Amino acid sequence: MYGIEYTTTLTFLILLILLNYILKSITRIMDYILYRFLLFVVIVTPFVNSQNYGINLPITGSMDTNYQNVSNPEPFLTSTLCLYYPVEAETEIADSSWKDTLSQLFLTKGWPTGSVYLKSYTDIATFSINPQLYCDYNIVLMKYNANSELDMSELADLILNEWLCNPMDITLYYYQQTDEANKWISMGDSCTIKVCPLNTQTLGIGCLTTDTTTFEEVATAEKLAITDVVDGVNYKINVTTTTCTIRNCKKLGPRENVAVIQVGGSNILDITADPTTAPQTERMMRINWKKWWQVFYTVVDYVNQIIQAMSKRSRSLDSAAFYYRI
């Protein structure tokens, strides 16, 4: 009986010693692998151009924060940039290969060939009918013209912000604007907008609901019209529906992947609808050059600084759908 107990105890001790040996062997092997791996990392690290990620990056709800822990000096290599310009620039430059030249200049700033798209538009009024902004970053050049200053301001308000829009049936319903973010946006070849404010008995205030000639005209033959009326009041609306489409829109916030560069003019256009607030100049910039080559040279020279004031977004603007948050 004692012999069996001694044998069991001896077997247990042998297994314990064997297990201890195995564990020590595994530990030595792991230490060997770990030390070799760390040595490899130390040797290779100076030769690797990697992007470092901080542990405590702030989550702010905005992508505008400039993170200083990016070791790659060219953060825009995987992005696309659209540059919109009036067609008069092509006429003045009169060089069939000018886009290739500009592409090579963008390459010196870290934008590979094929990542920058140059798109022309006829004029502000035409561009207002159907602005389409599809790139990760979009820069719109607008040449200042005193005669089209208000058109430029409305177009800037449209493309620098995101809008959520619904159709309006003005033949059946009255409409009212609920707050400052609520606007009526009209687009078309010719938009003439007339409104008649109503009292609580749905009678016209200073106008007759049955006679559109007594309505108050707020836009005349415009291609783009952003209408702002007194909030909380019902309105009967008259629009030239054969040449214009009107939508009830809500401004959701800034469209941060779009910037507008005003070419010329003494001051940057103010697109703020509320007269009690400071002028809205965020992502609104100005270049004072007479020649278009000078304008493009300046854009190339400062393109990365301009991009830093923007945020890369995947959503695009296609007003053909008249639904601005896509």
Swiss-Prot record:
One of its GO terms (molecular function) is metal ion binding. N-glycosylated. Residues 1-50 form the signal peptide. Residues 165-167 are annotated as: CNP motif. It is found in: Virion; Host endoplasmic reticulum lumen. It comes from the Viruses. Ca(2+) 2 binds at residues 177, 228-229, 231, 301. GO terms for cellular component: host cell endoplasmic reticulum lumen; T=13 icosahedral viral capsid; viral outer capsid. Residues 253-255 are annotated as: GPR motif. Disulfide bonds join 82-135, 165-249, 191-244, 196-207. Keywords: Calcium, Capsid protein, Disulfide bond, Glycoprotein, Host endoplasmic reticulum, Host-virus interaction, Metal-binding, Outer capsid protein, Signal, T=13 icosahedral capsid protein, Virion. InterPro entries: VP7 (IPR001963), VP7_1 (IPR042207), VP7_2 (IPR042210). Glycans are attached at residue 69. Ca(2+) 1 binds at residues 95, 206, 214, 216. Some rotavirus strains are neuraminidase-sensitive and require sialic acid to attach to the cell surface. Some rotavirus strains are integrin-dependent. Some rotavirus strains depend on ganglioside for their entry into the host cell. Hsp70 also seems to be involved in the entry of some strains. Calcium-binding protein that interacts with rotavirus cell receptors once the initial attachment by VP4 has been achieved. Rotavirus attachment and entry into the host cell probably involves multiple sequential contacts between the outer capsid proteins VP4 and VP7, and the cell receptors. Following entry into the host cell, low intracellular or intravesicular Ca(2+) concentration probably causes the calcium-stabilized VP7 trimers to dissociate from the virion. This step is probably necessary for the membrane-disrupting entry step and the release of VP4, which is locked onto the virion by VP7. Homotrimer; disulfide-linked. 2 Ca(2+) ions bound at each subunit interface in the trimer hold the trimer together. Interacts with the intermediate capsid protein VP6. Interacts with the outer capsid protein VP5*. This is Outer capsid glycoprotein VP7.
